[in-house]
Each structure stands twice: as C-alpha cells, then as structure tokens.
A protein has these predicted regions:
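Face-selective signature of the C-terminal outer-membrane beta-barrel domain
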Residues: 319-335, 358-500
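Hydrophobic, lipid-facing positions within transmembrane beta-strands of outer-membrane proteins
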Residues: 167, 227, 240-242, 254-258, ...
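Extracytoplasmic beta-strand/coil segments of soluble accessory domains associated
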Residues: 129, 146-187, 207-208
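Short acidic/polar hinge/loop motifs at secondary-structure boundaries
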Residues: 64-65, 168-170, 186-213
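Short, acidic Ser/Thr/Gly-rich low-complexity loop/linker segments typical of extracellular
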Residues: 49-60
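Short, acidic, small-residue-rich periplasmic hinge/interaction motif at the N-terminus
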Residues: 29-35, 42-47, 76-80, 90, ...
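A beta-strand signature from Gram-negative outer-membrane beta-barrel systems
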Residues: 152, 200-243
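Transmembrane beta-barrel wall of Gram-negative outer-membrane proteins
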Residues: 250-277, 289-336, 361-368, 372-374
Length: 500
C-alpha cells in the first residue's frame, strides 16, 4: 500500500513539473450587455483545461502562463448566460479579451457536478439532471429538505407514520433504499440517519439541489440505482451579506433563520443557524372519501417538533499553491419530536401506550481539497465524519409486555403494565467516515475520471424488549423483559473509472 501511495505522489509531481511556464498572459474585463456595468467576480476559464481565475471587485481579470496557440475563453457568472471568445495566445505576450454577458432567466448556466462527478452546465449535462435553486426553495417557503422536494417531477416524498412522521423519498418508482442523498457529494446519510433526515436537513445553507434520476448516477454506488439527490452548500462571496428571517404561523409554527457570509482576499466564511418549532396536529382519520377523512381520530397527523440546525463553512483559496482550494465545514443538528395518541395529551408522556418520543443529536464535519495539476489535470480529495445519536421511546415494549401479562380470565382486556422504573429508551450511536479521492484529466476530446470511494461505519444500539412470541407461551421466560445490545459495522471500498 505504501509503495502505491509513493508511486502516486511521484506521478503527480512528474505531471506537475510538465506544466511549462509560457509567460502568455490574458487580461480584460466583464460587463453586462444591458447597461454596460462591470460585473464583479465573474469566473474566467480556459476551455479544455482546468485553468481559471476570477474577476476582481471592478470586473477586471488577468491570468498568466496559458497554453500557446488558439484557445477558447469562457466567462461565467450566476444569473447570466456564459460567453465564449476565441483568442490566439503567444508566448511572452499579452492578449486582451472583453466580455458582455446577457441575463439568463432560465438559469441554464447553472453548473452541476452530481451526474458525472465533473462540472457541466445544466444545458450540456449528459445525464438527466434537474436543479432546484435556493431562490426556488425560498419561494416555496420550504423549511427542510422534505418540503423542498415536494412537487419536484419524478420525485415522491411521503410520511409513513402518524406517531413519529418518519419520511422517505422515492424515485423512478423504486424504494427509498435505492435513492442516495448526498451532501456536497458525500454519502453521509445512512439508514439510521435517513429515517428522519429529510425533515432534519434545513434549507438555510442550501445553494442548490441537484437531482439525478435513474441509474446514470451509478458512480455513487448501488444505493443510487433510482437516482441521487446532491445538496450543494452555499459558498462565500466577496459581497458581505447578513440575512435574517422570522415566521409565525398557526398550530404553533415558529421559524427563526439567520446567516452570514463574507470573503476577504483568499479566505471565505459563511455561517448559518435555524430553529423550527411546531405543535402536533390532528385533523384527519382513515377513510376513502373526503367526508370520511376530514374528522379527527385522536392520533397526531403532524408530530410536535423542535429542531435546531447550525453550521459553518470555511474556504481557503490558494492556501498552498496556485489555484488550489481547501474547504472545511461543520454542522450540528439537535431535534426532538413526539406524537401519537392526543386524547388527554397522552402523547406528551413518552412511556405510555400509543406514543413515540425521539431525540436526535448529529455532529458532522468534512474537508475537501482541490489541486490543479498542470493545465489539464486535477486531483480532488474529500472526507467526512459523522456522529449520529438517536434516543427513542415507542410503544413496542409496553404493548408486548401488556399483551404477555393478560389475565387468562379476561383475554380481551389490557394486561398489567410494567413498573415505569424498568423502562428504557432505544439508543443508537453511529460513527461514519467517508473518504474519497478522484483524479480528472482532459485528453483531447476526452475527460478521463478515475477515483476511489470509501465508506466505513460503526453502529451500536441498545433497547429493552420482552419475550412475547406465541410459540414462547410455554417458556418460563415468556413475558420477561430483556436488554438487547447490537454492534454492527460495515467497510466498503469502491473504485471507478469514467471516460466522457
């Protein structure tokens, strides 16, 4: 293994040394076609290479050591259509290129990365991809990922339980286990986290959602057979910004949001915080017609929920060498939800029949590093760590205990209840690490991508149960409570190669 790593380092150093200094410089400015004002912070890139720069606050740019000969220069800026210009680069000389960008009302200039793990404009992406921008999410007033995905064509989000409101997302008619949820390209939402994850991921830090439908997203593994949903976090901009949002609604709904972003020279920082509160609702019951359904049945339709969501993103531009980038992120989620039988506020007591009380604590951190190598290659390393804890009480133990302690003379009546002092919640703790390494190289008309992805997880869970199976009725242990302790782990490593 050490020999392989050493060989990789030598190869990268060799490739980097091949990047010759041509001293060919390109400079100019970027303006809006309508009005002629300079556009700050537009991105200038050389097509077919990974060479790029960004305009300063006055809309001017310069970039040096470009390949000699005829080159295609592309100017991009969010909200504007990209523009391409052909220039002739000469060694030791400067060349000028001036851009005038038009507005892009359809946002076809959005750059997406999910489908092929490489950057494409939405209009050029080879895999069916939909983009839901932060502006669209704001217009929907979506408080979480579940609400943001509602109504997106080809996606079905649904709640499966009145007592706890656990949710799942389906694509292409397949089950939720075949849809992969990613955060900045990392598969950090496991089966444990995914049960309530759609409603726990706030929208305050989402720049866009990239939705890839179908098996074209197979680069992310077997969990993405139906498709993948990639949550792209916001990146700091040169214009300092501070936003706040407070909302109040019926049924005890309260929402507080705050965020800030700034970039100074080669360092950028963004922070966000979000708190959502809502009370339990009971407005419907089972039925086949509207008149049958629109009556209360005493069981929560929406659970009582309090969620706190906060995090930061720290960007270092060119920290070690020219055009490289280092990103460090941290996020935390704290949520409590409880629901079930609402008669006499029974759902407020976690240790009663017909109620559920779930508390979630989640801490995550990730690091991503991008290193351009020469003019046509790029190395990307990313890793994420997640600590996820869930503490839950439900009526499984209580129901089984009462069922196994019925009076034989009165089988239709509830059995004896256990001593509350022996009852314990279900507790699960999971630690997950997801490292990945990719190498991209442009060879003529081909873009070659190779990479390796790892997924390592450790899960420990404990719960209180009771022996209550029918075939155990003659056993002396029938009706006896016991504690179950489970330890599980998974180590997955995948290698992929792609030519496009």
């Amino acid at each position: 293994m050490n020999k392989i790593l050493l060989l990789l380092v030598v190869m990268l150093c060799s490739i980097n040394s091949m990047a010759q200094s041509t001293d060919a410089m390109l400079f100019g400015d970027v303006k809006a076609k309508e009005g002629g004002r300079h556009l700050a912070h537009a991105v200038i890139s050389i097509k077919g290479t990974n060479l790029k720069t960004q305009c300063d606050g006055t809309g001017h740019y310069k970039i040096g050591n470009l390949p000699v000969g005829k080159q295609t220069v592309v100017a991009t800026l969010s909200g504007y259509q990209p523009q391409e210009l052909e220039v002739e680069m000469v060694a030791g000389k400067g060349t000028e290129a001036y851009f005038e960008l038009e507005k892009d009302p359809l946002e076809l200039s959005q750059v997406v990365v999910t489908g092929t793990r490489t950057s494409h404009f939405v209009k050029d992406v080879p895999i069916r991809t939909e983009v839901l921008t932060s502006q669209a999410i704001t217009k929907k007033n979506a408080q979480n990922l579940y609400e943001a995905l509602e109504g997106v064509p080809g996606i079905r989000v649904e709640q499966q339980c009145q007592f706890c409101n656990f949710s799942e997302v389906r694509m292409q008619g397949l089950g939720a286990e075949h849809t992969q949820v990613l955060i900045d390209g990392e598969p950090v939402y496991s089966g444990l986290a995914g049960v309530y994850g759609l409603q726990q991921i706030g929208t305050n830090d989402i720049d866009r959602l990239e939705v890839v439908k179908g098996a074209g997203s197979a680069l992310y593994g077997s969990s993405a057979v139906a498709g993948a949903i990639n949550i792209i976090s916001k990146e700091p901009t040169y214009e300092p910004s501070v936003t706040g949002d407070v909302q109040f609604g019926n049924y005890g709904f309260k929402s507080y949001k705050g965020s800030g972003s700034m970039r100074y020279n080669n360092i950028g920082l963004s922070v966000f915080a979000q708190r959502t509160e809502m009370k339990a609702i009971d407005e419907t019951q089972d039925g086949l017609t509207r008149n049958e359904v629109k009556h209360k049945d005493g069981i929560s339709d929406r659970v009582n929920e309090t969620m706190n969501n906060l995090g930061f993103s720290l960007y270092f531009y060119q920290p070690f060498t020219k055009n490289d980038k280092l990103v460090i992120r941290g996020k935390a989620i704290d949520e409590q939800r409880f629901g079930g039988v609402m008669t006499n506020d029974q759902y407020l007591n976690p240790y009663t029949d017909g109620t559920e009380n779930i508390k979630t604590n989640r801490l995550s951190g990730d690091l991503a590093y991008t290193l351009p190598i020469g003019a046509h290659s790029e190395l990307n390393f990313a890793t994420a760590y997640v600590y996820h804890k869930r503490q839950a009480t439900n009526d499984t133990f209580l129901h089984d205990y009462m069922d196994s302690h019925k009076d034989p003379a009165h089988p239709d009546e509830d059995g004896a209840e256990p001593d509350v002092s022996i009852m314990r919640p279900y507790i699960a703790k999971e630690n997950t690490v997801t490292p990945s390494l990719t190498f991209t190289s442009i060879l003529g008309k081909h873009t070659l991508l190779t990479g390796v992805q790892g997924y390592f997880t450790r899960l420990r869970e404990t719960g209180l149960y009771v022996i209550s199976a029918e075939d155990e009725k003659t056993s002396p242990y029938y009706g006896v409570p016991y504690t179950s302790i489970g330890k599980k782990h998974a180590n997955e490593i995948g290698f992929f190669i792609q030519d496009e």
